[in-house]
Design a protein with these regions (language model features):
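Large intracellular
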Residues: 3-8, 18-146, 218-269
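Helix-termination/interfacial motifs at the ends of transmembrane alpha-helices
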Residues: 7-10, 14-30, 137-214
Length: 269
């Protein structure tokens, strides 16, 4: 589980809670921020619209469950991916491309394994690139469906919050005879806006951005795999392949890999 995401969500809730209970009425003031009707309008309305936008109810449930992906730690590290490819290039250089089939059995990543098998089968390099890039596009499209789901819900929350506020204001204006009810009724009307803003900024926007960040990382790593595998197929030197793949990385990450490689070489010596 990605602890950062969980801690962030919990911290947001704690900050809102503290903002409420540190007011003049302390814990008693918490009751002012609860209104069942406002919850029905904001949450129920926004969820209903998201169901309408979904291809099916099953797809809606699937998109809701994608929140688990935001909680998942991205296992593929840049340095690890590059080292795996360099190891494969060394195997291919010493034993030939066909030896990669046995090496593929120890690879957990399905995308990398598929690319290796294409090389072993002797597929044309341009066709290899086309097949792998097509799969990359399909992965990106699937991920973007989940990202857009949460981004769209982030827009629906405040919109339905405003609808609830307008409903509350209409009810308030119909009861203007009793001036003592204006303040409480106005407060209730504003709660739907608060709920909508919390739904968007506490949950939907952060989840959408986290999924987007995870997708960008995964796509970048798979692009590294594509270039690495095609370089192996072309018979390039492992050192050349390593330097080529490092060009995908930030300078700080490259430096980290160089330091780790230097430490490993020192240990072997």
């Amino acid at each position: 589980m990605d602890i950062a995401t969980l801690v962030g969500l919990i911290t947001c809730g704690v900050m809102v809670f503290l903002g409420i209970v540190t007011g003049p009425e302390k814990m008693a003031g918490f009751r002012h921020f609860y209104d069942l009707t406002s919850i029905f309008i904001t949450l129920g309305g926004s969820i209903s619209c998201m169901i309408i936008q979904s291809k099916s109810f099953g797809k809606f449930i699937e998109d809701i469950k994608s929140i688990r992906l935001a909680m998942k730690v991205q296992q593929a590290h840049e340095a690890e991916v590059i080292r795996n490819i360099i190891n494969l290039s060394n195997v291919a250089r010493k034993e030939g491309l066909l030896a990669l089939e046995e090496a593929a059995n120890n690879i957990e990543d399905d995308f990398l394994k598929k690319g290796i098998m294409l090389i072993v089968d002797g597929t044309d390099p341009e066709l290899d690139r086309s097949i792998m890039e097509t799969e990359l596009g399909a992965i990106d499209a699937r991920h973007n469906e989940k990202i857009n789901f949460w981004a769209n819900w982030a827009g629906m929350g405040p919109a339905w919050g405003m609808i609830g506020t307008l409903v509350g204001l209409v009810n308030m204006l119909y009861n203007m005879d009793d001036m003592s009810t204006i303040g409480p009724n106005m407060a209730v009307a504003l709660l739907t806006t608060l709920y909508g803003s919390l739904l968007a900024n506490w949950l939907c926007v952060p989840i959408s951005f986290k999924l987007k960040m995870n997708n960008e990382l995964e796509i970048k790593m798979k692009e590294v795999m594509v270039e690495g595998l095609l370089s192996i197929q072309a018979g390039e030197n492992p050192r050349v392949i390593e330097e080529k793949l490092k060009s995908f990385l930030a300078p700080s990450v490259r430096e980290q890999i160089n330091e780790q490689d230097g430490a490993a070489e020192g240990g072997e010596a």
